[in-house]
Curated annotation (Swiss-Prot):
G protein-coupled receptor that plays an important role in immune homeostasis. Acts via its natural ligand GPR15LG, a chemokine-like polypeptide strongly expressed in gastrointestinal tissues. GPR15-GPR15LG signaling axis regulates intestinal homeostasis and inflammation through the migration of immune cells. Controls thereby the specific homing of T-cells, particularly FOXP3+ regulatory T-cells (Tregs), to the large intestine lamina propria. Also required for skin localization of thymus-derived dendritic epidermal T-cells. Interacts with adapter YWHAE; this interaction promotes ER-to-Golgi transport of GPR15. One of its GO terms (biological process) is calcium-mediated signaling. The chain crosses the membrane at residues 34-54, 70-90, 121-141, 150-170, 193-213, 240-260, 285-305. The gene is GPR15. This is G-protein coupled receptor 15. The lineage of its organism: Eukaryota, Metazoa, Chordata, Craniata, Vertebrata. Keywords: Cell membrane, G-protein coupled receptor, Membrane, Phosphoprotein, Receptor, Transducer, Transmembrane, Transmembrane helix. It comes from Chlorocebus aethiops. Residues 55-69, 142-149, 214-239, 306-360 are cytoplasmic.
Amino acid sequence: MDPEETSVYLDYYYATSPNPDIRETHSHVPYTSVFLPVFYIAVFLTGVLGNLVLMGALHFKPGSRRLIDIFIINLAASDFIFLVTLPLWVDKEASLGLWRTGSFLCKGSSYMISVNMHCSVFLLTCMSVDRYLAIVCPVVSRKFRRTDCAYVVCASIWFISCLLGLPTLLSRELTLIDDKPYCAEKKATPLKLIWSLVALIFTFFVPLLSIVTCYCRIARKLCAHYQQSGKHNKKLKKSIKIIFIVVAAFLVSWLPFNTSKLLAIVSGLQQERYFPSAILQLGMEVSGPLAFANSCVNPFIYYIFDSYIRRAIVHCLCPCLKNYDFGSSTETSDSHLTKALSTFIHAEDFTRRRKRSVSL
């Protein structure tokens, strides 16, 4: 395989490639120059406002802070940093792929997108593990689920994400084609393709498997508790519903784009390409907006499904309602689940020990 003929998209944005065939494909997609600027402006406005309110509400909320809130604040900060770059891509789409803001912002904005993607996936994975420990292993996890541990984990995630984004700075460049500037990906060598494949597997698909595994274990534990109690516990049923909504939102946001990226890398490593570059480029171009929209929907998901965050946001926006209670209980759904399942697990352990002692 000739390295000079290898040109697939490797970054987390479907920017116009120097490859003329891909550039032609990009220009033939009718909605990009009209729909995407409008869509990204809406994502920018709602996302910046939503994440700012979410960070402010949780940071300045009086009283003790939940452990999960530390991860949520960092996730909102990651989304906010990415959203700041969206106006640059709005200008790019409106100008039919031309990059008019210089080489520094070409590299810098692509780097921030890569850091955001890695940071978001790792934070969501940690949040899933934290929820798994809180609900499935409430007693054993007490020594791990501490505030200082959460801060160390978040700092490590930021450091690792910044390191993983560094290849983007080297692979992105401002390219002149017919005297027109394009922020594009350099032609990929086989070695770079292999590195991209390994990085994609370990920074997306492995965390994705961890997230799905954690939530499946949580759902199974909740179902076992529901069957054991024999009661129609609305909070437990709602919690199971929320779990699948969170997983579904993550899958819809990132799986199509990263699957297209995976196929593009595998196709580039093969002697004979089974997937035409135009089809792969179109797949990433269509699925890219779904991935980026995830940065603006998270605050709304938390507001709708987390009563604790809903109260914090309302109190932040309307201090006059500070003493007004927006629910019958001040505890979060996780608190209810932790207490209920802790009792359930203790009962299970007691039953096992009793059966074991009887059998002996």
